[in-house]
UniProtKB/Swiss-Prot annotation:
Membrane-topology descriptor: Peripheral membrane protein
A GO BP entry: proton motive force-driven mitochondrial ATP synthesis
NCBIfam families referenced in this protein's UniProt entry, alphabetically: atpD
GO cellular component entries: chloroplast thylakoid membrane; mitochondrion; proton-transporting ATP synthase complex
Entry binding sites for ATP: G172, G173, A174, G175, V176, G177, K178, T179
Listed name of the protein: ATP synthase subunit beta, chloroplastic
Catalytic activity line of the entry: ATP + H2O + 4 H(+)(in) = ADP + phosphate + 5 H(+)(out)
Gene Ontology MF, one: ATP binding
Amino acid sequence: MRINPTTSGSEVSTLEKKKPGRVIQIIGPVLDVAFPPGKMPNIYNALVVQDRDSVGQPINVACEVQQLLGNNRVRAVAMSATDGLTRGMEVIDTGAPISVPVGGATLGRIFNVLGEPVDNLGPVDTNTTSPIHRSAPAFIQLDTKLSIFETGIKVVDLLAPYRRGGKIGLFGGAGVGKTVLIMELINNIAKAHGGVSVFGGVGERTREGNDLYMEMKESGVINEENIAESKVALVYGQMNEPPGARMRVGLTALTMAEYFRDVNEQDVLLFIDNIFRFVQAGSEVSALLGRMPSAVGYQPTLSTEMGSLQERITSTKEGSITSIQAVYVPADDLTDPAPATTFAHLDATTVLSRGLAAKGIYPAVDPLDSTSTMLQPRIVGEEHYETAQRVKQTLQRYKELQDIIAILGLDELSEEDRLLVARARKIERFLSQPFFVAEVFTGSPGKYVGLAETIRGFQLILSGELDGLPEQAFYLVGNIDEATAKAMNLEMESNLKK
């Protein structure tokens, strides 16, 4: 955490000159601190406990003021473990909220909630910092145009398009390609939009965070040789951190993203994995602060806390923050207050299907379960809307016929249904796509497919012009021209074998 000295007139008051407070009570990660009269800190101010424990080891714990208790006492939540703290220790008010480094120097680095690098690559080469608590952009600053955020991924752009500056919920279990999809989006936004990404690991498993970092280095999203060429900044608050850190790490990531949007005027992609853990941490802190629990034991301030985070994720006239949030649904209950509050903010949902992953169709995005508020004729245009609806109808009919096919076989279907099934299978395979970040695993070069090319390809399949091509020609290709070229190659190979 960078300490920002507070300025009063021409005098700068440093930490050493401030009147310190004293710890008077410790309840797990929550501290009560007494300050001299007239020296009370503001809500959200950062406090620092700098002392030595009983065996002489230095202690440096940052806290955030959450409540004013009266009688010159405040209640604060610690951002790191409170082991070794005792009553009577000195507490210094920094006079400002937690501030974290921002700007290009953060790319390719891993930070904790306080903005301290944790990747053993030395200090961050920037003096620019920003407080993690800021108000959402004013109405007058917002960009109200509804525009599609093109990802270059066919299934997303056609069937559940993302809104520029929108919020997307990513639903997927373990091993269905969520990490690879996240990395491809980070790669594509850098190439197609000249943008950058910020990844906020909120209450993640440490192993998963480490795996993501290693995979990003392997795929070139993080450039080890020239760290400044990296396309992403990582902010982690893992499962083993105190609830204060898990509750605020999302804001740290968002603050870094806001700088790229407002100052660098870039399109930014913000990943939050997992938004449920943000709510969970808030619930733990709420109980420790003595607030009365609300529905299902969640904090009474659930909607406000979620709103204060989500309202900052938006498009302004300078740039945009498009957010992709992994959503854990407790006990698969969509009416649980945590996911239900999240759904109210989402513009699109991308659902990953284990069934498609088992078939080898990647990205394993479920074309029928994924939704988007952007898929309307007045926003995407009649041609896009009609093509998307016909693709969905074809796939839905294929899904309905699958039981009949399994029991009686394809031969029992009508001629019309057999043709529809053949086209649906081509569509299903054409929704797959080779990824840039998966080149090291698959050996096939990645493809970025523009929206116009995507629509043209699916129109050709639906029109029946490509009925004569084998379905394997559509598997893991970019645009439709590659599929026809692949079909010719397959035909030549089969002729040679004869």
